[in-house]
């Protein structure tokens, strides 16, 4: 089973955040780190790989600085890393980011694609749905427990009414 995990390099949450006055975007010149919930997704992919075999590929779209996050995922045990990068894409919106990630994921032909809950720099929590839509693949979000049985994937998520499976 090939599992792709999308990860994002975000500003270190322990340093102050500022807007770049020239671009009105988040200043990303300081220290960066792999997004915290993406670490959870990498760990889940590695757990699945350990139980069922396969390959874990981490994918990121961003500046070359994002290589730091990819290296962290490789150090955790991921097999390969892919960085999609273009300086002209700095500050890309949801549409451009989902397009770039979907194209990279199409080339990988992953059996399962995982994302973290949301990024700590924007709290958007919608990129995964845009990528799933572009890939024309089913989406299960907010998953707290993931199960694999052959070619069947099940997810359990908590709602205000209990659990959905």
Language-model regions: role of each:
Residues 1-165:
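N-terminal glycine-rich FAD/FM-binding segment characteristic of electron-transfer flavoproteins
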